[in-house]
Every structure is written in structure tokens, then in C-alpha cells.
């Protein structure tokens, strides 16, 4: 069940508000964050068709409610308008390319089907960040119109189109849905309207209402060739064109690898109706079908069409060995756009990321994409020549990081970088990727972990354009640049600069088209050196005006300590009306051999001031999803008051944020009426989810939302809702394992029941220890207890002595099925320095298994490992951890989610008289301590004179240490 709180009551409206929350909600029986069970494509589209017949372009609130769609509807909407791309081929870093060639990433949006890409507390999620080369994104893992609005926000702010979901049709797996779909969409109009098909206008209106860019098809059935299927989509595309809906498209994938005069009419378009589809041509024998490009080009030209929306298909799993030379060896081949596909519930980029813990895994995920897009050197100025052997894409674990794509020329060798940063100041980034192990505000942790792609900042135009000083065309690598989640100023990530340079390096981050519409241009920059005392940063912000080759350098100066520091710096040389074309950083020459600097916030602004729409009175609704004695998780909806603004509401029921001067919304929290206000999230959506906010059970929680103007200074008043704590008995929160969490996060192509039944550890014994292990079981002790496949054998303690040699025997259960530890990697770890991690070089004590194949010895007869305890192992409590994870996926290391895995821990004690090694410093030791300050521009307001009135409780279920409502 759920409990809802709102501030007062709202007057009923004839048409649905833009946010689906202004109502008294019935209790929900869903124990999940999002409930998509009421969603049925035909019913949704039927609503839009009926609305159009009634003279409206979108349904009423009551009509949506009639099919069960209420609060969660806003999570599939994006109010972020797609930004225009600023093109100038003369400014592209790589010149020997077709500057108009386009890349379509037909990939999943988030890890998992259904709601994987929606806001959550899953830090180790997919934060794709190469929108700067991507024209179109496919959202392959969602049904029609169900792609997460948070991902569409991220795509649109970077100028990328994104479909709202996909329909699958496969002739070998036909459950009747293909015929039902054909019957539905090809229903003819009988009421004399302008359209031949009953639902053609509904398709367009629905996409516009939800804020996405159309529909995607996996057409491996038969209906895509029929005249009515083609005719329907031709009419849909014509309607979108006639209504001037920019970016609307229809993706079409079939098994055809090329176009011909005979198939172009149903795969792409014709001279009478124009281009109907974004056409994804199939790969052939799992490789780019370059041989078909000349014939495809001829067929397109013969039909009088353009090549703008024809893409040759590439199977992403084969990124490291495809016909890249052949696809780029003449002008005909270079005219062909490329689409990368792979695969159904997670992208291959995300699947093949590697690391020893979630933070390093996320860091290496970004580096893997940087190699794929910018080239092996992670700099578009220095790339291997285009070749057909890019280096290994899939590797076993983090020890092979340097082998991944180490000969990649990168997509930068084939496509121009893209920028949508404009048209006027201000510009701001917190280098947020859209997730974090913790949520930071001005360097201090407020809660965590979190995931929300709507909070991903505009990505850098270049990853990473490191050059010599004052020369954008000369490659340099003295300074390394990388994203990190170890620390942040605001949100969950920052960039780290490291290395050594005597002459200095420039890091050109963004190409822009930012006009200073007012005077007094200034820069805000937040950095962290990690050094005590006063130290020179040797760091400047650099700006370059349009029409100039000279950089304007704005030095940061010194830091006064090891914590985050922010400064506002005056900029001279940019007058009102002038345009900033490039923004970057400069590390000036330094004698330090280990330059280290975190950059967490960069803003370039002027005196522009724009009033923002406030929230509509009493519109904020908060739904409590989980609660313990120490934390609260909430889902929120709200609606801005756009009545005084000129908006497109009457067209499609959509109000874009830029129409009401909204850049984003801040989510605020306070514990008790007099408590300190904390920022716990940001979003561009009109809804969000914030999980695990810490607070005492006795305190009343206050959740607030305010809008932030496009001037990034003006804010609306905060609208607050008071949430009294549940008065019944709440569970204590799960005690955090200081060694970090290891659990099964995916069952791969198996089932949960089979994994629990068949994947478990049968025996772990030792010899030679002071106190040996003798763990032996005949079934999975987690069956019926936990689905996480992690077992702490607390009653089996291993005691060892410094310098002692011991032998560990490990045997997995031999299930005789494909769900078995036989098909896993198995790694073993011991903490030797007492810092509650396993990251020292000698703390990985054994690795077993083979990439993409089984290892029978894991289950029969079992593994044997002999180790010597280091003489300097720290005496005291320790831990033995053994982690199994699918051998077709990189091993996650000692912490993080496994695939079809099983993890087991044993308590340890190390004895001896030798001095123990000093505990290695971890990233948490370097974070700023203390409580986060209050958000800016609060001006003493409380806004909580009124409190929530609808505070009835429904039933509560307690499971896994959490109360779910």
C-alpha cells in the first residue's frame, strides 16, 4: 500500500494538468516504486483518438484515470524541449569526414527492462554520456511511450532525438500481438475526418504529449511489408510534418541489410510520400554490410529521397572487429549513416564495463565509452587510424583495462562532434553524470545512493580535448582528465585533473554559442586540491569569443585548505552582445610531479535576470514508498503555474520548461519544523523519486520543491509538504556492511528460482590455519530467505597467524544445468590492512574461471588455493570473501552486483606480533566532513505554515528490513 500527502486541495480542471498528481489518490497495492501494470498501449492510444474526435488533442484527467493511469504517468514525460544543434564544419576537430554523417545509438536506456532507467537508488546504473556524437537514441528496452522521461531530458538538453519506446514483432515468436497491432493501427476512419486511419493522429498527439520523438519498431515479422502498415505510418509522418513537430520520427528495423528498388517503398519511403522511416538496415553475418551501401545509395537516389535517415546496422558486441575501413574508404561509404545496436536489456558498453567496486566500475564505464567514441587515447586529436581490429571489447576483469579498445580509432574518426549549448548565458555544469554513491551539496553528503538521468548535466563537447597551451590543434597528454564519483561538489560526480606539466595544458571542454545578453560576465568555479594550507592551483578557466583566436584566461588563484572551495571570478574582455564560442580549463606549468585537482562546478554567467514560474498552489503530492526508523523514501509530483506564460498547452497538453523559464527543480528536505534545509535532488521533470533520506523516526519530515530560473539565480518560493512518521512499529534499517555489499543484481538469461536452486557454495574448508574452516551444506541456505545470493557464514570463523601458509578448498554445487557456478568466474579476497576493503594488490588471493566458457573444476572436484598470510598483515578482525559471477560478463570485484552469482563471506581473525601494515587511505577518508549548508536563496523562508491534510495510513508490509506502503 502507499500513503500520500499533499498541501490542501486543488480545484478540478476540465483537462488534465501537466502533472498527474493534483488529486486524492486511492491506496496503491504496488510494493514497487513504479506501477506500470495499468499501462496498455491500445487503451492509451484509444484515449488520444477519442480526445481528437471530441475536438481535443489530449485526454482529460478523468479519462486517464479511467484506465488506471495516475501518478506514475509524469515519469514517462519530458518537459525538456530538444535543443538545436549548432553546426559549423570548419570547427569540427576531425576534418576528413562527412560532416553530415549521423550516428544512431539503438541501445537500451538504463539497465533492465520496464523501469531500469527511471529514478532510483541504484547507483551502479547506466549513465550513457556520449550524446555529443549521437543524433538519435533508440530506448530499446521499453514498450511504446514508456521510455523514461529522465533519459529523454538528458538527450534533449544535448540536442539528441530519442524515441518513446519500441514494439517487437518476430515471426518465430508470434503470440498474436503482431496481428492485433496490425488490426488496431490500420482501422480506417469512418467519420469523415482529414485522415484515412483512425489512430494516425493519436500516434502523433501521444508522442507530443509525452515529450518524446516518436516510435521504434523491431519488425522481424511480416506486417511491415503490407500496404496498410506503410500507409498508416506515412500518414503519421505527414501529420507530424504538417504540424511542424521537429524531431518526430519512426524507427524501423527489419532483417533487410540493404535497400533496393523493390523494397525501398516499405523500408524507407517513396517519391510520392517522402521519407517515412528512420531506416535501420540490418548487419550481415553479424558485420557491417558495406557491400550493400552502393546499391542502397542508388535506390535512394532513384526514389528521389535523401540519405539523411538511412543507417547501416552494426552489432555492438562486435565493435572490436568489424568492417570499419570498408565503411570509410570512399565518399559513397561515408555518406551512409551508422546505427549501433546491442542489446535487449542493457547496452554492451554497460555490460562490458569493469571494476573492483561500483565506483571504479562506473569510472571505467566512462573510459570505455571514451575509447569507443574519442579513440584509444581518449582524445579526438590523437586517434589510431581507422582499422578493423580495435582491441578487446570484452575482457574478464579490471586487471585487463588497458587491453580494452586499445586500438580504437573512435567514432570521432567518422562523425562530427555536436553541441547544443546556446543561445545565451548563463551556462552551468556540476559535471553530474546522473548518479552518485552519495548526493552532495557543496561538497557535503546529504543522502545516497541515487540515480536520475534528468540530473545529468550537458556533457562535454570533447572527451577529452587536452592540448598544448593556446593551440587547439596540438595534442598533449601531460594532464589526464576523468570523471570520478569518489567526490563531488553538487550531485554525485566531478572531474579529476592529474599529471605533471611544465609548459601547461589546455582542456577544451565545450564548444558553445552563448551570447552575453547583459554585462558583467563572471565565472564561478569550485575546486578541491586535497592539500592542507594555502596552495597555488595553477588552474584557470579559459574562454574564447566567436571570431577570435585568443583565449581569455581567468585564474582561480590559491586554495586555503584541503576541502572544496568555490570562487566567483570577474571576466574582462567580453562585452554585452558578444558570443562565447569555447569554454575550457588551463593547467599552467607546475613543478609538482603529482598535480591533482578536482573540479566540481563551473558557471559562466552575466547579469541576466528572468522570473520563473512558481509551483501551482497546493500541487505538490508526496507518496511515501519505504520507511525505516532511520530513513524515508518518497515519490513526488508537482505542477508549475504556467497560466501567466505563453505556452503550447493548447496544442498537445505539453508545457516545455523553457516556456515558463524553468531550468530545473530543486528537491529540499528538512527534519522537523525548525530543522536545517537540505538539498536532496534536482530534476527537469515534474516528478521524481528520492530514496533513503536519513531522519529520526520521531521527527516530522518536510519535503519541498522549488523552481530554478533559466538565469540560474532566481528561484520560486518553496512549496512544502509535511509528512508525519508512521506511528506503528517500523523496522530498524539494514546494518551497512563495512566491507561493502556484494549481491546478485541480474539473473542474466536465467530465472531467479533456478539461480537460487542451483547456484550456491557447497563447501569451503581450510587446512594449516590456527582455526580452520569446515563449512559444508547440502542446499542453498538462502532459499526462501533472500534473493540476493549473498551469505555471511558468521558461525564459521577463520583464524590465521602472520606468515602462516594455509590451503583453501572451495566447491560449488554441481547442478548439471546452465545455472551453475561452473559457468562463473570465482574470485577470493582477504582484507590484510583492516580498512574494510579488498583493493590492495595482494588482497585478491585467487581468480578462477574462463571468459565465455565454463570451468568444470569449480564444481567438480572443486578449487584448491594455497596462500601465505603476509608477515605485515594487520592483527585483528578481518574478512574472507569469495564472489562468483557469470563468466560471460566481467567480474564485478569484491563489491557490487553479480550476474547469476553467489557470494559468501567468512569472519576472520589475524594474529601475530609483527607491526601491521598501515591501513590504505580510501576515497571516503578524503571527503569533506560535516553537515551540508542550506541551499542558496532561502532568505529565511519556511513555507510550512500549512501542513498536509490527507494523512491517512494504509496497510504496511515489512520485508527485508524495510516498511513498504
Residue positions per predicted region:
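Beta-strand-rich modules
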Residues: 692-715
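Extracellular fibronectin type III
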Residues: 712-728
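A broad "non-catalytic interaction surface" signal
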Residues: 731-916
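Conserved aromatic anchor
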Residues: 632-658, 963-965
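Chitinase-like catalytic core of GlcNAc-active glycosidases
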Residues: 96-121, 125-295
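Extra-cytoplasmic beta-strand recognition segments
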Residues: 449, 495, 505-539, 567-571, ...
